Amino acid sequence: MMRTLLLFDGLGGNNDTLVSALRELHARPENLAYFHGVFAALDDVLDYLGADVRDEVLPAGLPLRRWLESGFPPDALRNSIVAGVCVHAHQVCHLQPTGRGANEAVVAALGHSIGLQAAIVAGLRPRRVDEFLALAASSLKLVALSLVRGHQSAGGTGANPELVSRYLERDSRGRTPGPMASLTGMSRHDLHGAMRRYNESGRSVSLSLVNSPTVQVLSGSTTDLLDFYFANEVVFEQSRVTWSFLSNTIPFHSSHLAPAALRVRDDLAFIGPVPGPESLAMPVYATDAPRDLRRSTDLVDEFLNQVLVRPIEWEAAAAHAIGDAGIERVVDCGPGPGARRFTRECLRANGSNPRFESIEQFSRRAR
């Protein structure tokens, strides 16, 4: 039996294949009860928020059942609330007690950014279907409300139209600027220096994710990120640094979202009971430092702080998870390829070489 780690992607899983993958899962008869619970939980969340908040943060609504049965509106997944809900629903569907969640080869879980909550669900390993469905509902409510509160807290991260137009003249891909941007090819030392000089002017750009030795992500207001880009444009060009705005509408892993993490605590009575770390049946690893969450004090606090506020140190997290749990196989639970790609690059730098396979491959073998 190969010691197996379940790996969950973050909002990088919001790609062209997410909708088709979610629609395929929804069409399977064995997932009927699960999706019934998903739709009911989302209806409860929307009722809880009220019409004014719904219109503010979800202008297209979130009728997931109708979208899966007929079609998603254009750009629906550009809203990070919608994207995060879809990513989480996709990931947790694979953890039902009759499927991979019950496989004894699985000995640990690790989630990139918002994928942490799916990793926690995997680690709790409910054995009965009713327990799983109750956990899935509370987990989806936690994720959805965290995204809503994050969106509300980030209300001031809009962009200066002149800076946006100036940037789009340079970006051949035409990706709309937002509150997170990825840099590839710049050393951490040089990036810290550039950020320090920029932030001394009273602006606020923060390093939110160190995904691999070559890929880092910044968070801040869209205007600040654009201004930072133009302040360093010549250096980026000379050093062949690639800059790319992410499709996120929320600046994850930054101090901008500290108020959101606090606000979700006020929503917990609605969210319902969430098991504590003593209920984890296997290691679930943190992403801010080499830690096993079985030794934490509160899984909700861990999710809120690690996803909304604290930066990710993926190389340290991935290396610790693989070594600590003696992992021989990593199962990529998707829905996107980002977590797998970053993990492979980080482990290559550390000399580790576990086998990687997709959740679909693992699923076929488990039947």
Please annotate each region the language model reported:
Residues P73, A118, A122-R125:
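Surface-exposed, active-site-proximal loop segments in enzymatic domains
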Residues G123-D298:
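Alpha/beta catalytic cores of group-transfer enzymes, especially the acyltransferase/condensing modules
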Residues L18, V121-G123, A261, F342:
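Short, function-defining helix-loop hinge/capping sites that tune catalysis or transport
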Residues Q91, V107-G115, A119:
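Gly/Ala-rich beta-loop-alpha elbow adjacent to hydrolase catalytic centers
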Residues G12-G13, I114-Q117, T222, I250-H253, ...:
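Gly/Ser/Thr-rich loops at beta-strand to alpha-helix junctions
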